[in-house]
Amino acid sequence: MASVKLASLIVLFATLGMFLTKNVGAASCNGVCSPFEMPPCGSSACRCIPVGLLIGYCRNPSGVFLKGNDEHPNLCESDADCKKKGSGNFCGHYPNPDIEYGWCFASKSEAEDVFSKITPKDLLKSVSTA
């Protein structure tokens, strides 16, 4: 009976040790970030999820990450997203290649004006289909 308990305990510790060693080299995707920071959160393994135009929080990419995009009124992947959410007519993408989405603006000129104050104009990517 004691050997069964000991064997179970050994399996438990071996499993726990396996999971702990996998996370030792993993990047910490926590804290505050800027969508303009490259790489975001200090690691290309993390994503910066904006809560405002200039500030966000670091997270590992996952299904929860994509779900947040649908729920946020200003995050977009296309002009159609902005129109559907009623947040604007133009999706101005962040110049950071690690961020797959943008911010809704009333027009392309408004997006260029805002982003030009933060970063050079030529980095603004347009995904407008119209």
UniProtKB/Swiss-Prot annotation:
Residues forming the propeptide are: 64-69, 123-130
Q: What is this protein called?
A: Albumin-1 E
The signal peptide annotation in the UniProt record is 1-26
Briefly state the modifications made to the protein after translation: The C-terminal glycine may be removed from PA1b.
What does the comment on domains in this protein's record state?
The presence of a 'disulfide through disulfide knot' structurally defines this protein as a knottin.
- Recall the GO molecular function terms of this protein's record: nutrient reservoir activity; toxin activity
Cysteines engaged in disulfide bonds, as pairs: C29-C46, C33-C48, C41-C58
Which keywords annotate this record? Disulfide bond, Knottin, Seed storage protein, Signal, Storage protein, Toxin
Query: Which species expresses this protein natively?
Result: Pisum sativum
Q: Which domain of life is it from?
A: Eukaryota
Question: What is the protein's known function?
Answer: PA1b binds to basic 7S globulin (BG) and stimulates its phosphorylation activity. Involved in the signal transduction system to regulate the growth and differentiation as a hormone peptide. Toxic to various insects through binding to a high affinity binding site in the insect gut.
Asked if the record carries the keyword Transferase, the reply is no
